[in-house]
Amino acid sequence: NYVTLTNMSDADVERIITYRLEPVNISFQTMNPELRCRMLQNRFAGDALKKAQRFYEAGIVMNGQIVLCKGINDSAELESSIEKLSRYLPYLQSVSVVPVGLTEHREGLYPLEPFTREDAQKVLEQIHRWQDRLYREQGTHFIHAGDEWYLLAGQDRPKAENYDGYHDDRVMTRGIGLH
């Protein structure tokens, strides 16, 4: 399960650190505090990112997720988020990027657009570029695309070795690397 950290008190953070309750799975969405507030419709959502910094400083193992919304937290925003999240290595072990799930039951909700094949190809190019860079610099691919991106783009999914030696529940329960 992933948490946004918005409802987590400072006492909760200290308890996690004291008792080493890890890993903490965080739904980041974006590292832009203002955008995160808008996306989560919570005025404290941007401040919640400081809690992830606190976990990092305490050496708490984390995993992350970004639910990508077309035209909102993709492209340049995704680039910035990956760059900032990679600073949390090695304690932030991996980040999965998945497309927002859209259904026909969206009446009264913020209008979101589905990603196209071309969009998915661009997202994969961006993620693969970061994977190559981080593997060279840090020895980890770190950022992983949800299987939906490969299906939508019409591309084969990566081999198990691209999951940095842990092709297990840490990534598979997030829809990453299911073969």
Specify the residue positions occupied by each region the protein language model found:
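Auxiliary Fe-S-binding modules of radical SAM enzymes
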Residues: 86-88, 94-96, 100-179
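Conserved Radical SAM active-site core
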Residues: 1-91, 102-130
